[in-house]
Design a protein with these regions (language model features):
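Acidic/His- and Gly-rich active-site-bordering loop/insert found
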Residues: 1-45, 66-69
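Short, conserved glycine- and acidic-residue-centered signature motifs
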Residues: 43, 49-53, 142-145
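Glycine- and other small-residue-rich loops at beta-strand/loop junctions that grip anionic moieties
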Residues: 46, 80, 138
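Acidic/histidine-rich catalytic neighborhood of metal-dependent amide-processing enzymes
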Residues: 50-124
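Midchain, well-structured core segments that form catalytic/ion-binding scaffolds
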Residues: 89, 95-171
């Protein structure tokens, strides 16, 4: 995390992750970790997700410094996003203690060069279902947690299918 410009107002955060999806099982015609260029396009592992954005942000730092910015630019880069967003958790923990936080964030995820107001996300929950044991002769006196877990999984799958059939918003 770094700030260019004043540190007494929120400013703009440029954020991205520095890792890439592993290449295992992918077929490349050349070394994916060696960048190649062709007709003003660059090819290589992570060129659009998200190393291109990070390279542009870092290459702009000298100009940002020279401009004597009145509104700060915050560079907030994380790691291990592709395997569970490990690095961003630590970044968030650090930023939570800041008295003055960025007012807006620009995340350099690939979006076909369109500005959007959101991007895919993830929510994880831990669910504990507790049953009630009983003798097999009196099963109506018990509660089978596995049956309720199966119903819950079925409900979640139906909701997922319903969401896939709905039109998406612009994010």
């Amino acid at each position: 995390y770094a700030t260019i410009g004043p540190d007494d107002i929120g400013g703009v955060m440029l954020s991205g992750h520095s890792d890439v999806v592993p290449t295992r099982g992918q077929h490349w015609n050349s070394d994916p970790y060696q960048i190649k260029s062709d007709d003003n396009a660059f090819y290589g592992r992570g060129a659009c997700d998200m190393k291109g954005f990070i390279a542009c942000a870092l290459a702009s730092v000298p100009q940002m410094v020279d401009l004597k910015l009145k509104t700060p630019i915050h560079l907030a880069f994380s790691y291990d996003e592709e395997i569970g967003c490990v690095g961003v958790k630590k970044l968030i923990n650090v930023m939570e203690d800041f008295e003055i936080k960025p007012r807006i964030g620009l995340i350099g995820e690939p979006t076909d060069m369109k500005m959007i107001i959101g991007h895919k996300g993830k929510a994880a929950f831990k669910v504990i279902l507790t049953g009630s044991s009983c003798h097999s002769a009196y099963i109506t006196n018990g509660v089978n947690a596995v049956e309720y877990a199966a119903e819950l999984v079925s409900f979640i799958r139906k909701m997922n299918l319903k969401m896939q059939q709905q039109p998406l918003d612009n994010s």
